[in-house]
Amino acid sequence: MNKNGFSRCADIYIGRLREEGRYSTAHVYQNALLSFSKFCGVHSVSFRQVTRDRLRRYEQHLYECGLKPNTISTYMRMLRSIYNRGVEAGSAPYVHRLFHEVYTGVDVRQKRALPVVA
């Protein structure tokens, strides 16, 4: 297994998204990867570093940094997607319900903008 497999898998997928012209999606994946890499204190994250405990601590770190639940959920869903691609490619071991204890939902709230009056 590649020691820097998680970041490598992410970089390959981000490159593919850019080739398909999906620049906004690639940008979100890139931001999630950079944020998680900084949290881990490494330039390249290995699949071994993606653990339940680390994901919980990362989620708490993002809350403490003032990020909103939907932003945190977006980052977690991007990381989960990268992990799942690694599992499918045989680059990562499957860990049952790895992302189960972190928030990956979408918080639906009333918009703050004023309604348009016709």
Regions inferred by a protein language model and the residue ranges of each:
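Structured, charged N-terminal subsegments at the starts of enzyme catalytic cores
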Residues: 9, 28-31
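N-terminal core-binding DNA-recognition domain of tyrosine recombinases/integrases
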Residues: 12-24, 33-110
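Short, intrinsically disordered, charge-balanced linker/junction segments flanking boundaries
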Residues: 108-118
